[in-house]
Amino acid sequence: MKVRLGTIIVIAVLALEASAARPIPRPALAARLAEGPEIIGIVHWGLNTFTDREWGFGNEDPAMLNPAKFDADQIVGACKAGGIGGLVVVAKHHDGFCLWPTKTTEHNITKSPFRGGKGDYVKEMEQACRRAGIKFGVYCSPWDRNSAHYGTEKYVTDVFQQQLRELLSGGYGEIFEMWFDGANGGDGYYGGAREKRKIPGGYYRYDTETFAMVRKLQPNVCIFNEMDEADFRFCGNEQGLVDPDSRSTIGHYDGVWDHYKHVANVGAVDGTTFHPIESDFPLRKGWFYHESERGTTRSAAYLTKLYLSSVGNASTMNIGIAPNKDGLLDADDVKALSGFKTLKDALFAHEVKQGEPFNVVVMREDISKGEQVDEWEFVADGKAILRGKSIGLKRIRVLETPCAAKSCEVKVLKDGGTLQGVSFRLYRADPELVRLVLSATTESGETDTAKWMTAEQSK
């Protein structure tokens, strides 16, 4: 099959063998993939921010949660200015401290000075997201190093699942994504026991009860987890790096993480579930704010490179946001996010027609019947200048040297048998910008983005 810009022309290229039907997206997931957002964030703020830890032990004093200038609109506004279309708010981390007035534990925000003991951080963040016009999601850690009941059935039914009910039906509106990670026990306070606790496989009842409960309470929610029943999967690293030929389909999760992590970043042509990647990474060195990590904020250029690695390889991009002790996003972080949007938008600001020089190619596959493309070439004036295995939702490729071909096409060399169509668009970006982005590293310093700002951005 050859695909030309705006037109699909089918010709006999290969005698394709019939293959089994590919897994297709679930309804909620299909809508999410079609409508976005393709860039989201996950906000880590809480007692860990004040103890200078990544993981709290579970015995931290709630009195420490006393920000001087907490402003949800400042945090959310900076994220929106960075092109983020949805935020997953950490409502409870592994320390077990709940940032909303839960009835499941005394270890919650009402025992802190925040808003005079009457505050609700989750609600403030939710309302700020609604005001900004971006989507709102939640993460509630399954591991709870504070709860004396952790490791028992009572914890799952009366604490964890009940906390989910409060968050999903307790007045926080529509939840676009519910995050579940692989936090599976270890040492902790556990009500004063100060011991190590292990849990058996299936302890959280994700596949038998918990996910079904979540979907019943929030029919349009998308779930992030490695289990087959979830919608989005972990990319296998926390650097935002996705394999250039990654697929949204993947095989059954057997519960053995060492097996899964090797295939999570790539997927499988013969995968049994449609389970696209969400690539999460912290904007700074750590997920929570640490004063000692000033200067580690990813540069705008490197964030743009990670966009190409994630969204450009059919993944959702998830940026870790870490407000400081004052309850604000640091100026360095605000600037990096804003600069990222400037550079990203500049890459795609000038769409061109065939025959005009281009250096950015964006390919899309109609995945209504699953991900079908197994091998492709991008051909310019009869010569293959790009090659790959997968296309899927979106595949972005950037050329170091502009191409001025008169005729371009995507040649599908192999597919799953029910290919619905492939389209592509061409863009011409400033070669200096392309070099800046492609050469960016984690060590890249602050990026000067003024040259690529629009008139609106430069105000």
Where are these regions (language model features)?
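Bacterial N-terminal signal peptides that target proteins for export
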Residues: 1-7
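Hydrophobic h-region of N-terminal signal peptides that target proteins for export
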Residues: 11-19
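Mature catalytic domains of secreted/periplasmic carbohydrate-active enzymes
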Residues: 21-430, 434-452, 456-458
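Residues marking helix boundaries in flexible regions
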Residues: 9-12, 386
